[in-house]
Amino acid sequence: MCSSDLHYINSQMAKVQAVKAGYDEAILLSPQGYVSECTGENIFVVTDGTIVTPPTSAGALAGITQDCIRRIAGDLGIPYVQGNLLRSDLYTADEAFLSGTAAEVVPIRSVDDRVIGDPGPITRQVQEVFFQAVRGERPEYSDWNDHVDA
């Protein structure tokens, strides 16, 4: 078994524990206590208008959809940084969302029973542009899609 297999086993165990506890998803922390990622998605917070996502040095896997979010944020003029996040940063975030190949872009409404709230304006804006891009409605992101004749 290779190390990436162990990563996914740990993620799935965390997901099972989260669901048993009544949550939809688990947020994984690094050994140093930094927010790393969710079980199959990257995590983002929005604080003071800036999108922040954990770096790979915190244990986050680099994500294809994460890179799409970075590109969309840049195109929209929204500051985007990779930086260490503490669990408490999730509690005080203005907005939070996750992204992944299967999940796409999903707002986070609460963490540890602490309400973040409805999707905020930046999450909604990034989510809408992402959905338009994957539907082929945004020519500037046409390199993300391979069109297949049915």
List the predicted regions and their residue ranges.
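Glycine-rich phosphate/oxyanion-binding loops and their immediately adjacent helices
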Residues: 1
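Helix-start/capping segments and mature chain N-termini
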Residues: 4-150
